Amino acid sequence: MKGALGSPVAAAGAAMQETFGCVVANRFHQLLDDESDPFDILREAEHRRQQQLQRKRRDEAAAASGAGHRGGRSPAVASGHRPGAAGRRESQKERKSLAVSSAQQPDSPGGPQPPGQKRTPRRGEQQGWNDNRGTDVVLDRAERRSYREYRPYDTERQAESTAEKFTDEKPVDRFDRDRPLRGRGGPRGGLRNRGRGGPGNRAFDSFDQRGKRDFERYGSSDKANRMEDSMGGCGVRTWGSGKDTSDTEPPAPMEETSMMEECQGVLDEESASKVPELEVEEENQVQEMTLDEWKNLQEQTRPKPEFNIRKPESTVPSKAVVIHKSRYRDDIVKDDYEDESHVFRKAANDITSQLEINFGNLPRPGRGARGSTRGGRGRIRRTENYGPRAEVVTQDVAPNPDDPEDFPALA
């Protein structure tokens, strides 16, 4: 770390700290002298691990090949070491030579092959494991056609149908073949109308598609079949025989037809009588009228309200006596009332006509001259400023609210 303190990075950091007062870089100058790459360390560890695995596999292969020889080498050679070199490791060349010699031995046909030299199974063969011997068992099967090999759909189905017609065996081998008729849609990539219930399936109704039996369907229901069976036995609901029921049943339709004819005759008569009535009603209803006519019709049909109004008696009673005569003539009063009907009556104590009402303006308090002695706008107008106009300026006395003359009573 002493060398790190004198490094240019540390000097630059110190200069930055003095200049700006804030350093976000390596504060304690850690790992400044470390130039190794961490990925190199990981690669080296991985390489070491792979070498150990390879060495272990080679040792196991050498031990297995040494144990397979009959009366061959000594245990020192079988363990992978030469007898003269006990403390020295075996070289790579010696290991290779041991592996080649063990592979060329003719007296070990059942020995396991070294790793990396197994033969891939041929086409049509399958490898299985036998627990008794520990060797690979090869099972030959019939050669299949390639997965992507194109084959016309119609020709394939026709061949299968002809093959299954002449054989009584069940189609067990269909699980190993492609089954395009299984799902709702047809085969991938074309051939329309191959789905459920499509016309593509009608041509192949003769052969089994899913290994099941095809049942024939009839248009009649189960109830009809059961009725026929019971008729052959003891008749309908086990009463009488089939001949009895056949003899008694035909009159029923004749009675029904006669009833239907009577009902139709009654309906025709009713409809003929109703038709003119409907026509008359429609003629009465369809009448065009204006809005005024309709309103007048409504007013006529509307019930008028009746009020119990008491009427005055026009006859003068015989015992009536005139107490005093009126001061005004009736004709003058009527004329005045008709001409001045819009004028309201005045009370007897009304004195508003006797009052004198003046709308005079009171003198406004002045602001004073700008060039006043005290240098400011005055709020009170002084009389000395208006020498010749002193007689004009008159101030009325404010009205007294307690005085009835200033505030007359309003009726």
Curated annotation (Swiss-Prot):
Keyword tags: Coiled coil, Cytoplasm, Isopeptide bond, Methylation, mRNA processing, mRNA splicing, Nucleus, Phosphoprotein, RNA-binding, Transcription, Transcription regulation, Translation regulation, Ubl conjugation
UniProt superkingdom: Eukaryota
PTM section of the record: Phosphorylated by phorbol 12-myristate 13-acetate (PMA)-activated PKC isoforms at Thr-352 and Thr-373. Methylated. Methylation is decreased by phorbol 12-myristate 13-acetate (PMA)-activated PKC, in vitro.
Protein purpose: Ribosome-binding protein that promotes ribosome hibernation, a process during which ribosomes are stabilized in an inactive state and preserved from proteasomal degradation. Acts via its association with EEF2/eEF2 factor at the A-site of the ribosome, promoting ribosome stabilization in an inactive state compatible with storage. Plays a key role in ribosome hibernation in the mature oocyte by promoting ribosome stabilization. Ribosomes, which are produced in large quantities during oogenesis, are stored and translationally repressed in the oocyte and early embryo.
Cross-link Glycyl lysine isopeptide (Lys-Gly) (interchain with G-Cter in SUMO1) mapped to chain: 212, 274, 334
Family the UniProt entry places it in: Belongs to the SERBP1-HABP4 family.
Protein known as: Intracellular hyaluronan-binding protein 4
Notes on the domains: The C-terminal region is necessary for nucleus and cytoplasmic localization. The N-terminal region is necessary for nucleus and nuclear bodies localization. Regions containing Arg-Gly-Gly repeats (RGG/RXR-box) may be preferentially methylated by PRMT1.
Disulfide pairings: none
Species the sequence originates in: Rattus norvegicus
Cellular localization per UniProt: Nucleus; Cytoplasm; Cytoplasm, Stress granule; Cytoplasm, Sarcoplasm
Organ and tissue specificity: Expressed in the heart. Expressed in cardiac myocytes (at protein level).
InterPro entries registered for this protein in UniProt: HABP4/SERBP1-like, HABP4_PAIRBP1-bd, IHABP4_N
Modified residues (Phosphothreonine): 352, 373
Pfam families membership: HABP4_PAI-RBP1, IHABP4_N
Main location class: nucleus
Basic and acidic residues composition-biased segments: 87-97, 138-181, 205-229, 292-313
